[in-house]
Amino acid sequence: MTLIVGRAVAGVGAAGIFSGALTILAYSVPLSKRPLYTGAIGSMYGLASISGPLMGGAFTDRVTWRWCFYINLPIGAVTIFGIAFFFPDPPRQNTAEGLTLREKIVRFDPVGTIVFMPAVICLLLALQWGGTTYPWGNWRVILLFCMAGVLLLIFLFVQYRQQDHATVPPRIFLKRTVWSASFFIFALGGAFLGSVYYLPIWFQAVKDASAVGSGIMNLPMLVSVIVASVIAGAAVTFWGYYTPFIILCSVLSAIGYGLTTLWEPDTGSAAWIGYQIIIGAGIGIGFQQPLMAVQTVLEIADVPTGTSLVVFSQTLGGALFVAVAQTVFSNGLVSYVAKYVPQIENPASILAVGATSIQEDLPAEVLPGVIQAFNDSLTDTFVVFAALAAASIIGALVVEWKSVKGKPMEMHAA
């Protein structure tokens, strides 16, 4: 319970970190130069994605998992100091001066938040329980889906009534570039965050890698994300147009994820390194571009809201499709274990073994079949990521072709 509450509190704090950094950037750097800096921030995200699993694995293997949380304290303290002393609060339009306390609270859209959070929780529980804990036709799963649908409809109604004071203001979201960029990053975020979670599991279960080893084997994708993000940021700064990079991102990512579905236990390093580089290059090229798209079409006063919408879509896509991937993986593993290792009376028991323990905990006579079952269930999961990357092309093709050099924007010194 303490861990759950602690992670919830940490999640509340972390919710504004990425969008907050991008909002600070919007108030500090001209739009024409912003892609380069946004790419740099994206590269830091990739660097954190590299160092995080490696450090987490090292802490877990050699010290204690608690250091995965302790390490955030000094880093957070330095960040707080830097923002507090070096970034002055910029002037803002539509401030809450003169409003009563009740009116200020209403502007936070508490009703929308109260409705939306349980809607997402119901949807995630339904996706995680369906086919594993309970059959898809079980009344609990059906009820959760129904509750999620009803709550989402109520949320949409609240957003319509609140208009500019809504969590998702219709005036902003219904702009062509905003909703298409949000859909693009929703799909791509689901693919990328899901693969960051499940690719290491493939290395652990199929290639017998340790927690640290799987992080190292995942480096080709994450390093290429960093390099491509910086290159794309510089290219957009020089050329001005971001839409071609969004489209190329969808194409490369779909190809890369599609190739991972061909992996087998005997797949060589050239294949799993090369395919990860394709994925990373695609993700790095386009992952930051939706932010530039919405900042180009919106006025400076709306940029924080537009930026938050894109980051929100990315996070929501990751949360939903990690749950979907978990369902595909769990159901597939049970099915494939029954197929390849029929002598195991309870195939679902393999789920409790864990990817890092199968080599040590299972008898030698069943190990090849279990490894094949892990491989096939994980490649089925990679199909989800490939489909998401392919679906992101819909949003990519709808994003307007505009240049960051074609729109002078108000900027405040920082």
List each model region and its residues:
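Helix-loop-helix hairpins in multi-pass membrane proteins, especially solute transporters
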Residues: M1-V111
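Interfacial helix-cap and linker-helix signal at transmembrane-aqueous boundaries
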Residues: L3, M55-V63, L127, F203-Q204, ...
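Helix-loop junctions at membrane interfaces in 12-TM secondary transporters
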Residues: M1-R7, T64, L262-Q276, G332-Y336
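Transmembrane-helix exit segments and adjacent C-terminal regions of multi-pass membrane proteins
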Residues: T356-A414
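Transmembrane core module of solute transporters
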Residues: V111, W136-T305, V399
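Structural signature of transmembrane alpha-helices in multi-pass secondary transporters
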Residues: A10-G11, I41-S49, P53, G112, ...
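Hydrophobic transmembrane-helix bundles of small-molecule transporters
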Residues: V63-F183
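Small-residue-rich alpha-helical segments with characteristic i,i+4
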Residues: M44-G57, W67, W272-S349, D380-V384, ...
